[in-house]
Amino acid sequence: MAGIYIHIPFCKRRCIYCDFFSTTQSEKKSAYIHALCQELDMRKDYLEGEDIETIYLGGGTPSQLTQKELEEIFSSLYNIYKVKENAEITLEANPDDLTPEYIHMLRTLPINRISMGIQTFQEETLKLLHRRHTAQQAIEAVKHCREAGFQNISIDLMYGLPGETLETWKEDLQQAIALHPEHISAYHLIYEEGTALWKLREQNQVEEADEDLSVTLFKTLIEELTHAGYEHYEISNFCLPGLHSRHNSSYWTGKKYLGCGPSAHSFNGTSRQWNVASLDKYIQSIQQGELDYEIEELDIYTRYNDFVITTIRTHWGMSLSHLRSIYGENLYQYCLRMAKPHLEQGVLEIKEDTLKLTKEGIFISDGIISDLLFV
C-alpha cells in the first residue's frame, strides 16, 4: 500500500505565516495541470506497482481548481495507478471557496474527505493572518459540506497566535467541537524566517506567545478535545474513533509515498527526493521530458532516526520488535539505553512491546525524541 501527494501551489493571496511553496500566478494553472499529469505518468514506476490507499491534494489552495482541472488530475491518477476502491482521497480547501455549488461539484469527483484550513474563529486574528474567510464562512462551509453528504471532514486550527488568550482559545475549541468534524489538527504557530509574520515580530509589531502560555494552550487543547470524545492519536492530531488521517498516518508508519508538483517530497523506503520549488522551473523541466529534483539516499542511521521521529509522536508508539528486526540489535540496544532515563522519569513507557510517550511525556516530546536519535 502507498500514498500519493499532489501539490497545488496556487493561492489568491499568501497567509503571513506560511512558508510552503505557493504562487499567485493563477494564469499558469493550465500549463501546470498539464505538467503535473505528465509527471504522474513519468513516475508511474516509482511506487513499483503498489496499490494506492490514499491521495492527498494539498497546497497552496487546491480549492482554487475548477471542475475541469480536478477532473484532469483524477483522470490521470486513475488511468495510471491502481487506486483502491476504499481509498481515502482528501482535498485541502479554504472555507470561502466552499460554496454550495462548489461542494456539489466536488461530490461528483472521487474526493471523500475535506480538510479545511480554518485556523481560528477570531475575526481580527483572521484579518491579521491574511486569511480570506470570516468565522461565519468557516461555520457555514462545514455545514454545507455535511449537507452535501461529506462524512469525513477535518479542520485545521492554530494556537499561540498574536493576541491570543486562554479564553479566546477555549472559544475556538468550543466552536470547533460544536461543528463535530471527524478530525481536528491543531498546530502551534511557528515564526518561520522570511515570512511576513517573522518580519512583523522583528519590527515588534506582534509578540510571540511565551512558553508558559503555549503549554497551557496545548494542555487545554488536549483536555477539551478528549473530553468531547476525540482520540489524541498524534501530537497535533485528534479524531473521532477510527477516523484518523490515513494519509498522514502512512507518513508516520513509514509507508512509501509519491509526491508530485513543485516542492513535493517522495519516499520509497530507501531514499527521499524532492522536486524543485519553482513553478516555472518545474513546468519547463517537465516540458523537456525531465524532472528537476534532488535526492538523498538514506543510510540505516537516518532511517532509524526517521522511524523514531515519526512513530514516537503517535499513540501507537514504536514497535520494539519492528525496530529490532529492521534496524538490528545494535540500534535496538542503543534506543533502549537512551530511553532508560525517560522510562525511569515516567515520560516514556513500554507496553506490550511498544515504546510510547506517557501523558506527561507528550509535553516534552521534542526533547525525548532528540535523546533517542542516533547522532
Predicted regions and their residues:
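A short, conserved structural fragment
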Residues: 343-353
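Local cysteine-cluster metal-coordination motifs and their immediate loop/turn environment
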Residues: 9-20
